[in-house]
Amino acid sequence: MPNIVLFSGSSHQDLSQKVAERLGLELGKVVTKKFSNQETSVEIGESVRGEDVYIIQSGCGEINDNLMELLIMINACKIASSSRVTAVIPCFPYARQDKKDKSRAPISAKLVANMLSVAGADHIITMDLHASQIQGFFDIPVDNLYAEPAVLQWIRENIPEWKNSSIVSPDAGGAKRVTSIADRLNVEFALIHKERKKANEVDRMVLVGDVKDRVAILVDDMADTCGTVCHAADKLLSAGATKVYAILTHGIFSGPAISRINNAAFEAVVVTNTIPQDEKMKQCSKIQVIDISMILAEAIRRTHNGESVSYLFSHVPL
C-alpha cells in the first residue's frame, strides 16, 4: 500500500507485527528508550513526510509510560509533516474513568482524549470501549471496533452445545452487548445484578433469567481482578448451569485474577489479544485467546483507502 507507514509502540509489539504481516507491510523504524532521569525518548527512524501514519499502542502494562510514549510518537510524526496520524489503541487507557461517579472525581478518559488531540492525532481506532460515549469526548473521528463478530465465530466453533446456551452479562451495564450476541445466536440471555459496596469488591448478586440445564456464557468488555466474573460463575452453577465459559475483550488480569480463575469452575476464560497474554497463559491453562489482528488490519486498510469501516461491525475479515 503506497503512502502508509505503520509504527509500533512498545506496549504490544507482537500484535503490531501480526497487523503489519496481514497488511503486507514492514513496521516502521522507531527507537524508544528512557533517559537516565526516566523521561521517554522517541526517535522516528524514517521519513514520514506526506505519509498516512498509523501508530499501534495498547493501554496495558506500564500504562502511563506507554501513553506518554504514544503521545510523543504522534507529535514526532505530526511535526515531521505526515499527512495524517491515526492512533490505533486496541485497549483504551483510563476508559473506566469516564464520569463523575463521586464528588471531585476526575473524568480522566476525557483528559486522555484531549491529550491525544493536542499531541496531533487526526483519527483514533480502538476496540470495545468501556463506555461507547467516550467517542464523544473527541473532536476528531473515532472508530470503535467490536470484538463481537470474532466472539460469535469462537462460540460457534468451540462450544459444541452453543445452541443450548444462555449468554449472561455479569452486570447491568453489559446488557446491550449480551442481548446483541444472544440475538445473533438465537439463544436466551440472562443478567446478574450486583450491589457494590467498595471498588473491586463485590457484594450481593441476583440472577435475572434462566440458566438451568444450559451452558452459561459470561460476556463482558474487560476482566481486571476477576472478582465479578468468578462470583458470577459460582452463581450460575448454583442456579443449575451445566458449564460456564467467560468471554472478555480485554484481559487485564491484575492482582489476584489468575489464582481466582484457577480456583473457579470455568471451562475456559477467553480473551482477545488487545493486551499481551503469553505470560498469563503460562500461569493459567483455562485462558484462551482470540486473535483480533485481522480486524485491526482491515480497519487500517479501509481507513487508508477511504472505505467504510462499518462492515467490520458484523463480519470477521478473512
From Swiss-Prot:
Binding site for Mg(2+): 128, 130, 139, 143
BP term (GO), one: purine nucleotide biosynthetic process
Signal peptide segment: none
GO molecular function, one term: kinase activity
Region: Binding of phosphoribosylpyrophosphate, residue numbers: 212-227
Binding site for ATP: 96-101, 130
Regulation of its activity: Activated by magnesium and inorganic phosphate. Competitively or non-competitively inhibited by ADP, 2,3-bisphosphoglyceride or GDP.
Pfam families registered for this protein in UniProt: Pribosyl_synth (PF14572), Pribosyltran_N (PF13793)
Entry EC no(s): 2.7.6.1
Pathway this chain belongs to: Metabolic intermediate biosynthesis; 5-phospho-alpha-D-ribose 1-diphosphate biosynthesis; 5-phospho-alpha-D-ribose 1-diphosphate from D-ribose 5-phosphate (route I): step 1/1
SMART domains: Pribosyltran_N
Enzyme class, UniProt record, top EC level: transferase
Cofactor: Mg(2+)
A single GO cellular-component term on record: cytoplasm
InterPro entries tied to this protein: PRib_PP_synth_CS, Pribosyltran_N, PRibTrfase_dom, PRTase-like, Rib-P_diPkinase, Rib-P_diPkinase_bac
Keywords: ATP-binding, Kinase, Magnesium, Metal-binding, Nucleotide biosynthesis, Nucleotide-binding, Transferase
Catalyzed reactions: D-ribose 5-phosphate + ATP = 5-phospho-alpha-D-ribose 1-diphosphate + AMP + H(+)
Family stated for the protein in its record: Belongs to the ribose-phosphate pyrophosphokinase family.
Summary of the function given for this chain in its UniProt record: Catalyzes the synthesis of phosphoribosylpyrophosphate (PRPP) that is essential for nucleotide synthesis.
NCBIfam families attached to this UniProt entry: PRK01259.1 (NF002320), ribP_PPkin (TIGR01251)
PANTHER family according to UniProt: RIBOSE-PHOSPHATE DIPHOSPHOKINASE FAMILY MEMBER (PTHR10210), RIBOSE-PHOSPHATE PYROPHOSPHOKINASE 2 (PTHR10210:SF32)
Quaternary structure and interacting proteins, as annotated: Homodimer. The active form is probably a hexamer composed of 3 homodimers.
Protein name (Swiss-Prot/TrEMBL): Ribose-phosphate pyrophosphokinase 2
Organism of origin: Xenopus laevis (African clawed frog)
